[in-house]
């Protein structure tokens, strides 16, 4: 018998907003709100010349234009990453399913690579420093991650590993065929990838990190890698993959290179030093 401390999973409706035939699901709403907040927050950072040590290297008009391309990078990269990293055999047999985004299946690591492509392409086309555009993009990203993980929780998906039912906040997820008490790992990840990461980056920005191109980008990559690996210890692996080698999950495997890349970017940003204001506007 399960103890009385076990928390009942809230009975959320799958549709967040419904007006006649028009419906928006929670995950789509998380994407929309995350992108809108990110755009507004990016504009506020760019308006504050003190944070950059002079005029920001990106104009408000440019960041307005960039939103479209980074959104495409997130969606196309996220879906492509899920197809390649998590369920390739299924999609080889059912290629039409690749385009059924409403059925779910997105990968952060794929979305991140899609954003990298969008940043590099847009920066090159508009004469913007790539590292500075990467800094502003990753500075706003944690809010989208927070909302995405909350949407995962509301949808009752990507739940955590089974745990002792005596854990005070253990939950039984309605869609779990085993009906075992589990860690609400979506909320753990929301706290680490969203709240913690946003707070650390915000503090770094206030301390002048945007004056060192690549610093925020490197910190985001490094800290996300650390928090994702930590969260994977509580998250149930995708059923079609299970555990890989030595207890590694796909999420861990894809996050390990982020630790190296993030650390390299931070070291290079420190060695490079803060540019003079005249250099920052090139």
Curated annotation (Swiss-Prot):
Q: Which keywords does the record carry? A: Cell inner membrane, Cell membrane, Membrane, Transferase, Transmembrane, Transmembrane helix
Chief location? membrane
Q: Superkingdom of this entry's organism?
A: Bacteria
Write out the GO biological process terms.
lipoprotein biosynthetic process
Enzyme Commission code(s) on record: 2.5.1.145
Q: Which GO terms describe its molecular function?
A: phosphatidylglycerol-prolipoprotein diacylglyceryl transferase activity
Q: Pathway involvement?
A: Protein modification; lipoprotein biosynthesis (diacylglyceryl transfer)
Which residues of this UniProt protein bind a 1,2-diacyl-sn-glycero-3-phospho-(1'-sn-glycerol)?
149
The listed locations are: Cell inner membrane
- Topology term for the membrane: Multi-pass membrane protein
Q: Mind naming one GO cellular-component term on file for this protein?
A: plasma membrane
Q: What class of enzyme is it?
A: transferase
Q: Which Pfam families match?
A: LGT
Give me the segments passing through the membrane.
19-39, 58-78, 104-124, 190-210, 214-234, 250-270
The job of this chain, per UniProt, is described as: Catalyzes the transfer of the diacylglyceryl group from phosphatidylglycerol to the sulfhydryl group of the N-terminal cysteine of a prolipoprotein, the first step in the formation of mature lipoproteins.
Q: Which family does it belong to?
A: Belongs to the Lgt family.
Q: What is this protein called?
A: Phosphatidylglycerol--prolipoprotein diacylglyceryl transferase
The record lists the organism as Bradyrhizobium diazoefficiens (strain JCM 10833 / BCRC 13528 / IAM 13628 / NBRC 14792 / USDA 110)
